[in-house]
Amino acid sequence: MSSSVLLAIDIGNTNVTIGTFAYDAGAGRLGEHWRLSTHREETSDELGVTLRALFDQAGIDPRRVADVIISSVVPPTLPIWERVAAKLFD
């Protein structure tokens, strides 16, 4: 069985960096990682489609995501990414 995954999202002024960390025996190791451009006007639906496509391309089942951590230095984007996480992983 595949281990569960922590999804880390770091929203910066220029880029959004996303990484997955697999939980193995209590320790996380970096799995896939991606870098997207930060766009303040993107909707949660658009970002959700993008994130789902990245997961599909990497062969990651979104149901494996057990936890999501989001950090942001761009306050207007935080609620958008929170909605993405709630829609895809709750």
Predicted regions and their residues:
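Short beta-strand-loop/turn "lid" adjacent to the catalytic site in phosphate-handling enzymes
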Residues: 58-90
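A generic structural micro-environment signature
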Residues: 17, 42, 53, 66, ...
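Short glycine-rich, Thr/Ser-proximal phosphate-binding strand/loop in the N-terminal lobe
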Residues: 2-51
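Generic preference for flexible, low-structure residues
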Residues: 46-52, 81-86
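Short, low-complexity, polar/charged sequence segments that are solvent-exposed and flexible
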Residues: 27-28, 52-56, 88-89
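A short, N-terminal amphipathic alpha-helix
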Residues: 47-63
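Intrinsically disordered, low-complexity segments
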Residues: 1-2, 70
